[in-house]
From Swiss-Prot:
Domain of life: Bacteria
Periplasmic side: 30-256
Protein name as catalogued: Protein TonB
Keywords: Cell inner membrane, Cell membrane, Membrane, Protein transport, Signal-anchor, Transmembrane, Transmembrane helix, Transport
Species in which this protein is naturally found: Pasteurella multocida (strain Pm70)
Single biological process term from Gene Ontology: transmembrane transport
PROSITE patterns linked to this entry: TONB_CTD (PS52015)
Length: 256
């Protein structure tokens, strides 16, 4: 709008300038006729040219303003009115997640039962027969051990009961020494000592009721001596004059 009004004003000024210039030229050409027409004619012609120029300027129509773009109002979303006669559907309950199926345990195989051995039928023997059987077993054991003692040169009788007792004691101590084991911990700590073990001997030479009668001061050494006596085997029947209660010293010494 502003550019168009400026162009119209510029055009009017240019037209006025050219009209003035044309009238000036016309005035020079008609200078000689001024005397005849007089000064009033010049004024009239100039006045006419100015009116013509103004008329041309007024005849130009003013440019119409451009119409503003129509404002489009955004359509508001229509609110849906709930029908009171229609009942709303109840909301669906969310489905519960299915629990994962547990893997089925394989049935455990039952251990096969071992076939039971048939028990030997024990006949009820009278007391007299039982005593006979026990006496016979004792006699058999005595004979076998007796054979062992006769083969042992240390237990052969020399006609003196004292010598037989001493020989039996020496053989008994050697049997205990065979089963003696020095405890590793006691050896590392360089523990030493002598343990006296007292035990009972029956007529067949079987050891029982072993106990510590004198300690070495070390529990490990005492237990090792007691185990050695309990592991000793019978060396034969007791000789005449040999007591049933016997005490044997068991020595633990470290030799470099």
């Amino acid at each position: 709008m502003i550019d168009k009004s400026r162009s119209c004003i510029g055009f009017a000024i240019s037209l006025l300038f050219h009209a003035s210039f044309v009238s000036f030229l016309y005035w020079i050409v008609q200078k000689d006729d001024d005397s005849a027409n007089g000064f009033a004619a010049d004024i009239i012609s100039t006045h006419i040219s100015m009116e013509m120029l103004a008329a041309t300027v007024l005849e130009e129509p003013e440019p119409e303003p451009e119409p503003a773009p129509p404002v489009v109002e955004p359509e508001l979303p229509k609110e849906e009115v709930a029908d009171p006669t229609v009942k709303p559907e109840p909301p669906k309950e969310p489905e519960k997640p299915k629990e994962p199926e547990k893997p089925k345990e394989k049935p455990k195989e039952k251990p096969k039962e071992k076939p039971k051995k048939p028990k030997k039928e024990q006949r009820d023997l009278p007391k007299s027969d039982r005593q006979i059987d026990s006496n016979s077993s004792i006699n058999q054991q005595a004979t076998t051990t007796g054979n062992i003692t006769t083969n042992n040169p240390n237990l052969v009788g020399k006609g003196n009961s004292t010598d037989e007792v001493n020989a039996y004691r020496s053989a008994l101590r050697r049997e205990i020494e065979k089963h003696k084991r020095y405890p590793n911990r006691a050896r590392m700590m360089r523990k030493q000592g002598v343990v006296t073990i007292t035990f009972h001997l029956n007529n067949a030479g079987v050891i029982s009721n072993a106990r510590i009668s004198k300690s070495s001061g070390s529990e490990e050494l005492d237990n090792a001596a007691l185990v050695a006596v309990n592991n000793a085997r019978p060396i034969g029947p007791l000789p005449a004059g040999m007591p049933n209660e016997v005490s044997v010293p068991v020595s633990f010494r470290i030799t470099n």
